[in-house]
A protein has these predicted regions:
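Conserved P-loop NTPase nucleotide-binding/switch module
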Residues: 1-86
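NTP-binding/hydrolysis catalytic cores, primarily Walker-type P-loop NTPases
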Residues: 71-131
């Protein structure tokens, strides 16, 4: 998504259309949440709390890819969207890319590692066949 159509996407995701997937551009998973808010506001004037509620109920998982110094793209983080806390969208980092010591400027070597954070919405994701 790139603009005001973001609200249409979120509303479709929130009306029982399981299995939705989209791409967006952000510097991190939390930055992507802010970008989604901004893109909704590009199309309609709406209270930020309502936008955040739409995002938090529509999106289950955020997969963040990044370009590495060797020009490859790697999955850097996998986050679960937990809900709203203190007025902000709360993310739970599940996996993070760990670079290996043998990496150099020409080849980045590493792997995703599971964090110690438990999956919070496990039952919801199991119902959808994702956990």
């Amino acid at each position: 998504v790139r603009g005001g159509e973001t609200l249409d996407m979120l509303q479709a995701m929130n009306t029982g259309h399981d299995g939705s997937m989209s791409t967006g551009h952000g510097n991190s998973p939390s930055d992507m949440m802010t970008r989604l808010e901004t893109m909704v506001l590009m199309g309609i004037d709406m209270p930020l709390a309502a936008i955040r509620a739409q995002i938090a109920t529509a999106i289950d998982i955020v997969i963040h890819l990044g370009r590495m110094r060797d020009k490859t793209r790697k999955v850097l983080e996998i986050n679960e969207v937990v809900g709203i806390r203190n007025g902000q969208i709360e993310l739970n980092r599940l996996y993070v890319f760990k670079e290996e010591p043998e990496s150099d400027k020409n080849k980045v070597v590493g792997q995703l590692e599971r964090t110690e954070n438990p999956l919070i919405n496990k039952q919801k994701l199991e119902r959808k066949g994702l956990a």
